[in-house]
């Protein structure tokens, strides 16, 4: 009797993560954009400066039947999507998709992969510079969409347009730049892409 009860209670619990994963994967499409709250050392400063919960992002691709996130970390790479999700705070994420997904034809998706491939293995850009020597997460997504699809997800801002007043932000700026803060540097933030009217939400946890 106890064995039957244990099976009745425990089996559904063991199957829940698998079922949840399957539901997410059934909703995904190549080229979707995924956001989460990073637990990195700089995440809090990004959130304060941009006034957004979301401090990290990437592009979703399917490879050999499995889903990955193409992301700018150290270095730029493909990460299995469930590893990527669990790396974020509390396993929370939001997936967004182009409002007009028909734009992402097979040819455009091939161009997106090709555009992203030139960044593979490049170091993460701690200084948020707009050149391609190093790359940060939202810069990677923005440049891939711009080059391959001609779409600008969110508007570029100069560094001075962010809220740089919080002590945690000022400390991170001093750590990175010293006294020479590049206030005119063009930047694309995760929040700018998250708020883009070209995207619609399709999943979250």
Describe the residue ranges of each PLM region.
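Sec-dependent signal peptide recognition
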Residues: 3-11
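Cysteine-nucleophile amide-bond enzymes
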Residues: 16-205
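Generic N-terminal leader/processing signal
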Residues: 1-2, 16
